[in-house]
């Protein structure tokens, strides 16, 4: 049922793809959510969860927007803590990163373009 509109719940829709609700990894049956232009993730992270290994050789631009909680993002250019609703970090291609949820956290991640990491 491919179509050019969709209404849903990001938490539910993202369960199949680790929180990602829009991106190239969705099939034609997902309609407008299948995109090679942008990826959107609803990220729910318990306190202490993180990515210890650095993400390197990134080819996309990334926006990380804090909905709730406290979230540390370590970039190759510095470390930042998102702690107030609406705080965000934005970085371009070539910036390495890793992260940790310092409290139970909800973030929205937007990356563009949507490309395979392989």
Locations of regions flagged by a protein language model:
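A short hydrophobic beta-strand segment most commonly corresponding to one strand
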Residues: 43, 88-90, 103-118
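Short acidic-glycine-tyrosine-enriched beta hairpin
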Residues: 77-94
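Short histidine-centered beta-strand/loop micro-motifs
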Residues: 32-34, 51-58, 75, 81-82, ...
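Residue-level recognition of conserved beta-strand positions in structured domain cores
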Residues: 67, 75-77, 101, 109-111
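A short, N-terminal "cap"/entry segment at the start of jelly-roll beta-barrel domains
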Residues: 1-47, 52-54
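A generic "binding-loop/recognition-motif" signal
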Residues: 59, 95, 103-104
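Short, conserved beta-strand element in jelly-roll/cupin
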Residues: 56-73
């Amino acid at each position: 049922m491919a179509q050019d509109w969709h209404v849903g719940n990001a938490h539910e829709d993202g369960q199949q793809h680790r929180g990602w609700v829009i991106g190239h990894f969705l099939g034609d049956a997902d309609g407008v959510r299948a995109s090679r232009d942008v990826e959107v993730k609803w990220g729910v992270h318990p306190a202490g969860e993180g990515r210890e290994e650095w993400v390197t050789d990134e080819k996309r631009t990334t926006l990380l927007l804090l909905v709730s909680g406290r979230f540390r993002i370590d970039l190759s250019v510095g470390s930042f803590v998102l702690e107030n609703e609406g705080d965000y970090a934005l970085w371009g291609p070539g910036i390495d990163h890793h992260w940790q949820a310092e409290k139970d956290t909800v973030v929205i991640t937007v990356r563009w373009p949507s490309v395979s990491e392989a």
